[in-house]
Regions:
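Mid/C-terminal beta-alpha module of Rossmann-like enzyme folds, strongest
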Residues: 1-71, 89-91, 98-127
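Aromatic-glycine-rich donor-binding/catalytic loop that engages nucleotide-sugar donors
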Residues: 74-78
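Zn-dependent metallopeptidase/amidohydrolase metal-coordination segment
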Residues: 83
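Catalytic phosphate/metal-binding cores of nucleic-acid and nucleotide-processing enzymes, i.e., regions
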Residues: 86
């Protein structure tokens, strides 16, 4: 491949549900997912990308994030690894890190914050 290409992936857009399903298949787990609204996440001051990696609201400053036409790159031969394989390999790598590094994630919600958010969501959703 020669030239300048946009190479965001995947080759076809994935919904959040489909992406999480493929990741779960790759790491051989059955997650229990709770879907909450973007408005709830914003009200709870959950930061896109940092608190919930890969979650980006589709409006405001984030509109169009990672949404590029990649047909030229695909036509030139760009291929993506299967997402389940990438997830499995990433988990394998993560498990090689020292325990203290595994416990200090640089992104994502802490277990305590996740629990609090889910409790807040349950209180709002029950109304």
């Amino acid at each position: 491949m020669l030239g300048v290409f946009n190479g965001t992936g995947p080759a076809q857009p994935l919904t959040m549900r489909a992406m999480l399903s493929e990741i779960a298949a790759g790491i051989q787990t059955e997650p229990r997912l709770t879907w909450v609204s973007t408005d709830f996440l914003k009200a709870q001051k959950v930061s896109p990308w940092r608190d919930l990696p890969v979650w980006i609201p589709g409006q405001g400053d984030w509109a169009g994030f990672a949404r590029r036409d990649i047909r030229r790159a695909l036509d030139a031969g760009l291929v993506f690894r299967p997402l389940p394989q990438t997830a499995a390999d990433t988990l394998t790598y993560f498990k090689t890190l020292p325990q203290d590094r595994q416990e200090k994630l640089k992104a994502g919600l802490s277990a305590e914050r996740e629990t609090a958010l889910l409790a807040n969501w349950a209180a709002v959703a029950d109304k």
